Amino acid sequence: MGDDSVIVGRGHRGELIALHNTCRHRGMPVCEGESGHVERWVCPYHQWSYELDGSLRTCGGMNDQLQRADYGLVRAGVAEIGGLVFVWLGSDPEPLGEAATELAAALAPQGLERATVAHQIDYEVGANWKLIWDNNRECWHCHASHPQYVRANFDNAPDNETTRALIARRSSDHARALGVARAVDHGEPGLYPFPSPGRWWSASRTSLAPDFVTESLDGAPVAPLMGEYAEYDVGTLRVRTVPNFWCHASADHVVATRLAPAGPELTRVRVQWLVDREAVAGRDYDPGRLLPFWRVTSEQDWSLCERNHRGVRNPAFVPGPYSLAREQNVIAFADWYLARVADAGQVAKA
């Protein structure tokens, strides 16, 4: 994330460990691979080696008086919640608190601990990361730009009695199928309100349109049921954490999106499709049916964001007003971001 590089792995007992990827000697990264398996970390520069937990193991050529306990790799915070791994870079030893409780409850029926990555696509989007969040936080653009998405969802449906009655009926359908899972808690047109002051996370279950039991092009299942679900028609669970993650979880698959800003003009985006770990491609699911819905929708958004970025770079651009009816969440995101910038300024002054 920016200049921060963090190694996330598991120790010999399976415990999660996060380490800042910089040797305590001269700063060389000790891990340069995307993924893999090692018995210890070895700096490629002067061969200092570290145990998986970051403790310094060897440092040949150094003074015998060196206190090895003082020169382990610096730890970052890490925790697993409902199958998602969260890493934080600040000094707060455990900032999750209420978020951990809420997210764990929402994610419990999805069974992400028993999921596997069926497919992954890495994108380089020529847009500032904040423009990507602006795009994510409103669906005013959806009818013009996401014909596949609006067929499946109520995010941009008109707010009238007909729509509300339809959503109520679909919510009732989902409630019958949910069983032990969390019930629909966003039963109205439009997007769930997020973010809000002091809350960098949210989780909500939203109804799908009639004839859709999953987010696929035709609404039909694309993979075996995940987790605790006994039926497909459970709507979608949506999880969001600013500044860099969101996911849509249907009963049979999850699509997770992670942002990594690479400068003011570029954002690296990773999109992953997850299914139950027992599911086998070609036997239990067809990637040709699993991928298109969110691949098409995501790439439509990346195109919008890149074009928007070019427009705001125009010297003649002056920001216009937000729509209070359609862009409330964009306003909320701007407020969240400005508050974080102000907080950082206060910390710097201290």
State each model region's role.
Residues 1-91, 95-109:
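Rieske [2Fe-2S] iron-sulfur-binding domain
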Residues 15, 79, 84-350:
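C-terminal catalytic domain of Rieske-type non-heme iron oxygenases
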